[in-house]
Amino acid sequence: MSMILKISAESGFLYVVATGEFSLEEAKRTFIEMLEAVARNKLGKVLFDGRRLVGNPKFMERYYYGKFAGQTVAESTVRGVSPSTQFAYVLNVPMRDPERLGEKVALSRGMRVKVFDDLDSALGWLQVAPVNHLDAGDGT
């Protein structure tokens, strides 16, 4: 099963809902898809809701995803993605790593990213207002 993104441009941010089964290759593919939407919509904030993703990424997969994401954002400025774009990821365990390895690796490459366990905290960090139709993402 592949990862599927539902992307919508909201007032001031891009809202991305991801479903399916995690794999490193699929995560890289969908990250590029998300960056293309950022450039197309000229938005500087992304709310990535991955609470419906399934899988348990291995240590090195977390590292390689963080490295890929950080480098890809840095290299995407020529495609219209600002290096100051903020990315808030909302994930459940085991997709969300308590050690935040992927987040730390991406941060070390200049990406503005933070991982959360709830939507409200992510919206607060992005400093954007909630939108009524934002899905709970956790099946509730």
Regions found by a protein language model. Name each.
Residues 2-140:
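Amphipathic, Lys/Arg-enriched alpha-helical "gate/interface" segment within cytosolic domains
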